[in-house]
Amino acid sequence: MLKLNPFRTILLTILCLSAIPPGFADEQKVKLEYPASNLESDDYLAPAGWNLVWSDEFTADVVDPDNWTRQVEPAGRFNGEWQRYTDNVENAYIDNGCLVIKAIHTSDHHGMNQYTSARLNTAGKFAWKHGKVVARMQLPYGAGTWPAFWMLGANIDENGGDTPWPQSGEIDIMEFYGAKDNAAVEANIHFAGANNQHQHMGAKKFRLEEGWFADAFHVFEMEWNEEMITWSV
């Protein structure tokens, strides 16, 4: 991953939700240029003119606590999600050089608290403003899945700051809604508008020309400078 200058916090999570967000007007078709599932040939190389300032290739036996915090939260804390976020190893672990975030069905009770999952972030460890953020992921599929890779303001109150959401800001690098489309991911920006009311910009939707995002690994990228934010898949 490439990031420059402190300010933002990276968050990586997988959610099990049934909500469907607003539609996006700007859709881009994605055609694979190389086999994204080939681990040996897909090592990310910093582009010319960029310096690598932080990365995690998940080569250790366990999730590195110096890089990631396992955020513990009750079910329904953020989006009415049915799972609670735990610090259990079974919900987030390393397997064959990959970080696996797993939702586990733990109860036949309908609704809240029938799943556990993980919510990993870099709060209090690493934060960046401007730069390039890159992750290579293979997504789940099906109704109820909502994996996401996004950034929140380092000052957000859920991580010990003094600023509530959406005043803290949010940049969604990748969100996937299994209830809507297994071949599409979306990017978005959330912020506080007049009277601190939640506002958002439906910035981008990426759709595969063939197959699903669950079929193989894909590279999700966001570049942020003083003038614009650019997403790519």
Where do the PLM segments sit?
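Bacterial N-terminal signal peptides that target proteins for export
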Residues: 1-10
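Compositionally biased, intrinsically disordered/low-complexity regions enriched for serine, proline
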Residues: 3, 18-19, 32, 44
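Bacterial N-terminal signal peptides
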Residues: 10-19
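Sec/Tat signal peptide C-region and signal peptidase I cleavage site
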Residues: 21-24
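GH16 jelly-roll
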Residues: 26-233
